[in-house]
């Protein structure tokens, strides 16, 4: 049974001695294919049997069309069978009956017409087509069938007559194109021109004018082509003017080496067409200038095209500073100093609509780029200085300021070898609108000049202005530390951590602790940790405290390589004491998340430095996750994950056991007292 389940397995996977090709398999399959069933051939002995068979089939077809009159397939099968029996009159009768049922069936008309054409009844077919196009003058398929039949019969005048009847209904472009192709096949070019004249009146789209011009280009003269294009431009007017027409006209003139004519056509069109409708025209003009113009002409075309584009966008929204940026970059690439200045002056004249800093952020960069361009490209230092001064005067410093512009002006003054002006600029900035970025830039400048006394004064001013800025305290202390004034750095740190409000106190404490640890003042570091733990019980502080205790070298090991020195038992003991203190605090305050993080760090410590017993002791304290439910304010319940600590369960179990024993003792005492009484 087991062997019969599933697909058969091939145990021997070696190649067969005789290989079989796909061709052999296909040939064998075809040879063995059984012949399809064929209907027996009916033979009629005399006319009576034939008439009896025909009568029976007609009765079947009549039943079909009677049951479902609107199905044209039944009618067409009936008529086709009559045609096979050479009963043309009966077939016509069937077709006519079908047309009485549904005279709008175009497929039925086509079948009827094709049947007459196949049986060479041309007049019948012509009469049918005439009926059809008279009733359904908007059905192009009938007209196409009509003109095709007349042309195949060699009746070209009749074909023209049919086309003229058709064109009187003003059909779509395909019908006109078929008429034009007919006349071209028989080299009747004057007739083609007359058809094009009528065609462009009915369908005056630019592409049809271009078709006419290309016909004249192939069979006419250059004057005729120009006449067609001129007539098209005059007929369409400025309202319906299209860039494709001008592109085709200009390319024709360029083909004839009439470059000035082509350039004039492009410029004529560009002056009259709006930007939105002349994208391809601009591109074609650029390509033309690249091919047949000089370099200046090409660059002028590109610049003028983009200038027009930017001017239109600025006209729509003059406060869009991104467009001004692109515009000035364009003019800078042209190298025309006066144009660049003009665009910059127009740009900075577009002041923001309100005195909100978010509106000024992009605008201020126009001034910055203007000043940099005057300094670096135009080499006009006096003008650059005036731009900085005007920009600073323009900013409403009582509401907001931009430290970048003050710092850039100071750097500009330094590049001009005027240090006093740079200091005056930054001093003015700090006095008018102090910012951390301004203090930082000014201090960095003085540090680069090795003016450390000035740096101290600036740090003092910054701390006086913003005593809650931890970065200022840290940088100030690092400056003193870099100058080897440890006591001064320590005093700065002490002042910093004593501030009642700090933006990021954890950074300041960490920097102070790292400073003391780097200096080897381990007692001071330990005292700092203790002071910090009085302010916060964050789990990271406890973990870092324990790690600090591990990394304290013993007296004789201080000079050894830090990677090679072993951790002493005393250091391990101190670290464990820190972990135990932290665990006790978190346990008492029921801080479960912090307690879990601490136990994980403690476990990692024991795995690195402890014994198997120590590791097992910690693992016994590791909690397990349990799902609990709590009630919400809207009387709904939600599930949450909680931690269950084995140590807590053991202590509560011991406590409950003691309570049971006390309760039992109390009962015994009560029973003894009742017996004595």
From Swiss-Prot:
It is found in: Nucleus. Associated with the spliceosome. The keyword Nucleus applies. One of its GO terms (cellular component) is Prp19 complex. The keyword Repeat applies. GO terms for biological process: spliceosomal complex assembly. InterPro entries: HAT (IPR003107), HAT_Syf1-like_N (IPR055433), HAT_Syf1_CNRKL1_C (IPR055430), Syf1-like (IPR045075), TPR-like_helical_dom_sf (IPR011990), TPR_rpt (IPR019734). Keywords: mRNA processing, mRNA splicing, Nucleus, Repeat, Spliceosome. Gene3D superfamilies: Tetratricopeptide repeat domain (1.25.40.10). Involved in pre-mRNA splicing and cell cycle progression. Required for the spliceosome assembly and initiation of the DNA replication. HAT repeats lie at residues 52-84, 86-118, 120-152, 154-185, 187-218, 220-255, 257-291, 301-333, 335-369, 379-415, 417-448, 450-482, 484-518, 520-551, 570-608, 613-646. This is Pre-mRNA-splicing factor CLF1. Belongs to the crooked-neck family. It comes from the Eukaryota. Transmembrane segments: none annotated. PANTHER family: CROOKED NECK-LIKE PROTEIN 1 (PTHR11246:SF3), PRE-MRNA SPLICING FACTOR (PTHR11246).
